[in-house]
């Protein structure tokens, strides 16, 4: 982590003598560090030159300073890797992902376990129900997601928007799942489903790269030549992203049913513009003696 130390000298007269003073400016934090603090205000309160500070007073390194291969980065992701390793691009313009570009899949396990729960029992204790659209028009079902970071509120907002768009119903009603304490298949890394902050929508109308290559997905040559596929309307993607969720359909190793709450990878929500209630005064007409420059041109 690089930071800059700025010093300036101010000279003035006091009792006829020149005085000097030096002011030390705080280290400039990495943009990713600030975005983490901005995205998770319930848990993070500040930073040092290379640490984020949690509200419980503990700190966590941002950049471990190590040069890693891609596999090493996946297995020992630090926060700097999480924020800068692969950039997630929001929006409904989706180009075919480049080889091995899976933005959002570098996850600092220590960070998420501290936030959402370090054990299955702890993560499960933070689950709450939300109302989600069901198969029959006008009906609903209950699904369980974490209350940490207000994920339940954000996902409820998604559900409300989806319910108001019946043409999207078949894609979202028969969900693939939310909370499931498990590792990602073939790895020792925990799935974001372990924390109740991810949802898989209807798998019938979605694609997953391993399902499309069931017989031969472990062959390197197949993985190097994946053909991106997607049946999920981008209207659904736009709704999820607006509420802080990223989409697995933007990965080279596509998982188009998958959404997870990752607000740190998305632009911060725009604050509503508050219109002034101050009554505007009527401008006075320029007097006959006013300068010509004060009138209309």
Name the predicted role of every residue range.
Residues 1-7:
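Sec-dependent signal peptide recognition
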Residues 19-21, 273-297:
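Compositionally biased, proline/threonine/alanine/serine-rich low-complexity intrinsically disordered stretches
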Residues 242-280, 284-285:
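A cross-kingdom marker for long, charged
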């Amino acid at each position: 982590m690089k930071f800059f130390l700025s010093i300036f000298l101010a000279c003035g007269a006091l009792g006829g003598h020149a005085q000097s003073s030096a002011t030390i400016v705080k280290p400039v934090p990495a943009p990713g560090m600030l975005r983490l603090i901005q995205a998770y205000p319930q848990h993070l309160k500040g930073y040092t030159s290379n640490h984020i500070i949690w509200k419980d007073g503990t700190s966590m390194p941002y950049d471990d300073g190590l040069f890693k291969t891609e596999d090493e980065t996946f297995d020992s992701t630090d926060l700097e890797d999480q924020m800068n390793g692969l950039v997630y691009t929001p929006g409904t313009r989706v180009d075919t992902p480049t080889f091995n570009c899976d933005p959002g899949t570098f996850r600092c396990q220590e960070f998420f376990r501290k936030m959402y729960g370090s054990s299955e029992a702890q993560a499960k204790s933070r689950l709450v129900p939300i109302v989600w659209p069901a198969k029959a028009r006008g009906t609903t079902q209950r699904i369980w997601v974490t209350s940490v970071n207000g994920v339940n509120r954000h996902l409820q907002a998604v559900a409300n928007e989806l319910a108001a768009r019946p043409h999207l119903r078949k894609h979202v009603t028969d969900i693939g799942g939310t909370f499931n304490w498990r590792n990602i298949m073939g790895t020792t890394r925990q799935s974001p489903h372990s924390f109740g902050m991810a949802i898989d929508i209807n798998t019938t109308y979605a694609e997953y790269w391993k399902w499309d290559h069931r017989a031969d997905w472990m062959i390197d040559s197949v993985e190097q030549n994946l053909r991106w596929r997607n049946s999920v309307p981008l209207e659904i993607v736009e709704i999820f992203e607006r509420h802080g969720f990223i989409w697995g359909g933007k990965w080279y190793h596509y998982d188009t049913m998958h959404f997870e709450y990752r607000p740190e990878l998305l632009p911060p929500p725009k604050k509503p513009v508050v219109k002034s209630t101050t009554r505007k005064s009527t401008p006075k007409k320029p007097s006959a003696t006013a300068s010509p420059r004060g009138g209309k041109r």
